[in-house]
Amino acid sequence: MIRDEISVSTQTPRWRCIGSGADSKRLHYGRFALSPLRKGQASTIGIAMRRALLGEIEGTCITHAKLEKVTHEYSAIIGIEESVHDILINLKEIVLRSDPYGTREASICIVGPRNVTAQDIILPPSVRIIDATQHIASLTKSITFDIRLWIEKDRGYRIQSPKNYQDGIFPIDAVFMPVRNANYSIHSYGNGNDIQEILFLEIWTNGSLAPREALYRASRNLIDLFIPFLRAEEQNIDGMDNQNGSNMPSFSFSNISADMERMEEEVAFKHIFIDQSELPPRVYNCLGRVNIHTLSDLLNYSQEDLMRIGHFGKKSVEQVSEVLQKHFAVDLPKNKFQIH
């Protein structure tokens, strides 16, 4: 029992991407698994990650627009199909990405008749449009559509309070959150006191950053929250050590041996199920019929072994090999003599 507890405590949880895709330029999806975790850890991490994903990641939005000779949000402009209100709503939906903070200016100057889209926005070099086809306005006559825009990078959302629009400058409600939604679920396994958990995390983004990047940024933000406390505690410990004349032993992740790394990877593979990967249903159903349910089970087979499974041909083997290499950097051996 003591040895089991020690082995559990030395396992390092790892994130794995087990699914990804893009429904459109403005909707990207990713599914991730974190394991192994002790009982209760998955809920703690899941709640924190979801809140960090939805509230702590910066995004870029259009926050103000200036239209000449327009006095009210619900004004109609001759030669433009949409009202000013509709144009502002369309500008609010434009998805942008930028690196530096601060306010940037952009503009549109188009002569109709024609449709105005996001690709017509003249942007500073530091800002990029994610979907250039997003609609802004329809010019029905030969008029000049001239608009000035202000772009900001921030986090959360900013609801503009009603006020008088001076000099034709209209504030736009800004939703800076690049993560549209995030959900998590927990799978428990084991018996008795040796219960462990897997955290599954689903992330949808607006395309300005990939779900994998959102996961990294949320993790980084959570770590940054605790660093000041860790530094303060280290200073207190150093002060106590100097008074007592003793030294605390230093700890470094680089001290972990290669054997431990391999052991942790093997443990993680035992709890990643093949039906959660990008394999087609026909492929993992064939594998399930011969009791191959996890990546650990799968890695006990060579390509030649898989070819002997009923209705499992060369194309299926290639699909399995592609998923293993893409998501786990693992090569499936060609024959049983190359396993391990």
UniProtKB/Swiss-Prot annotation:
Keywords: Chloroplast, DNA-directed RNA polymerase, Nucleotidyltransferase, Plastid, Transcription, Transferase. The keyword Cell membrane does not apply. It catalyses: RNA(n) + a ribonucleoside 5'-triphosphate = RNA(n+1) + diphosphate. Its main location: plastid. Pfam families: RNA_pol_A_bac (PF01000), RNA_pol_A_CTD (PF03118), RNA_pol_L (PF01193). Its EC number is 2.7.7.6. InterPro entries: DNA-dir_RNA_pol_insert, DNA-dir_RNA_pol_RpoA/D/Rpb3, DNA-dir_RpoA, RBP11-like, RNAP_asu_C, RNApol_insert_sf. GO terms for cellular component: chloroplast; DNA-directed RNA polymerase complex; mitochondrion. GO terms for biological process: DNA-templated transcription. The keyword Metal-binding does not apply. Residues 1-233 are annotated as: Alpha N-terminal domain (alpha-NTD). GO terms for molecular function: DNA binding; DNA-directed RNA polymerase activity; protein dimerization activity. It is found in: Plastid, Chloroplast. Residues 268-340 are annotated as: Alpha C-terminal domain (alpha-CTD). It is an enzyme of class 2 (transferase). In plastids the minimal PEP RNA polymerase catalytic core is composed of four subunits: alpha, beta, beta', and beta''. When a (nuclear-encoded) sigma factor is associated with the core the holoenzyme is formed, which can initiate transcription. Belongs to the RNA polymerase alpha chain family. The N-terminal domain is essential for RNAP assembly and basal transcription, whereas the C-terminal domain is involved in interaction with transcriptional regulators and with upstream promoter elements. DNA-dependent RNA polymerase catalyzes the transcription of DNA into RNA using the four ribonucleoside triphosphates as substrates. This is DNA-directed RNA polymerase subunit alpha. It comes from Cycas taitungensis. The lineage of its organism: Eukaryota, Viridiplantae, Streptophyta, Embryophyta, Tracheophyta.
